[in-house]
């Protein structure tokens, strides 16, 4: 499990080669300037876009120090797999669509409006938001409800830093994340597969948990467009669709907010959506998972050996958030 202290390694004990494959470690402080991935990026093939992405030096703010409390002995998923096997329906429903089409997204300039039941509402420019707290690198597991998983080094800071800054009112019980929905930049928004814009939410105590990361980068680089640039949240004990991408609004509310997949299919996607091997999705068993990149065949993990899925994705320190709850009913 990832959470048990005796299963973790301290950062000083982990060779860089174990955290990042060597050929990728050499690229860790590189990125593509946002302007280079403007409208012209849509014409790039996925391999060309990846090469362009590694072309420029990373900004100073991205030199995040690895947090040894969030290291793991598990091997991270290769960068190429992380950036080409994605669910991001704003760019299409195939796993390859985000890498192929997300070049149209313009992550700069960018603003995030924090509003609702807070004493200090504010619209943050991306640069100001990134300076709010020290960046750190955390290696988290990501588990998709479709039965596949990855291990990814993310860069960001705890969402709780932002929450404390805006001073929630006592009546604020939930947080809603609203993603960009711009047909000019996101061709998938024209599809009726979901009600746009994409929306997700957390209970306030969930959002304040130190595991929740407001995320700006991965693998030592700025977030690629297809991975939710320029800012997203990572909630590692929940299925991946709970970790909203390309966020433009964060709302503090007193009632459980509507969430996109729950609206689309409430019998399949609950509000909580905690990783739970005992509660199957109607179309996918949740008892096991395939680790992307382990089949070595380039088939998206289709032939990777199955491994047992852990309750809360292995992050059992969140169990106290759900004391007394029937997690089959509140799935």
Curated annotation (Swiss-Prot):
Predominant place of localization: periplasm
Binding residue positions for Mo-molybdopterin: 86, 89-90, 144, 179, 227, 232, 243-245
Location(s), subcellular: Periplasm
Keywords attached to this entry: Metal-binding, Molybdenum, Oxidoreductase, Periplasm, Signal
Catalytic reactions of this protein: L-methionyl-[protein] + a quinone + H2O = L-methionyl-(S)-S-oxide-[protein] + a quinol; L-methionyl-[protein] + a quinone + H2O = L-methionyl-(R)-S-oxide-[protein] + a quinol
Catalytic class of the enzyme: oxidoreductase
CC terms in the record's Gene Ontology section: periplasmic space
Signal sequence segment: 1-54
Record InterPro entries: MsrP, OxRdtase_Mopterin-bd_dom, OxRdtase_Mopterin-bd_sf, TAT_signal
Record GO terms (molecular function): metal ion binding; molybdopterin cofactor binding; oxidoreductase activity, acting on a sulfur group of donors, quinone or similar compound as acceptor
Keyword Plastid attributed: no
Cofactors named for this entry: Mo-molybdopterin
PTM remark: Predicted to be exported by the Tat system. The position of the signal peptide cleavage has not been experimentally proven.
Subunit structure: Heterodimer of a catalytic subunit (MsrP) and a heme-binding subunit (MsrQ).
Protein name as annotated: Protein-methionine-sulfoxide reductase catalytic subunit MsrP
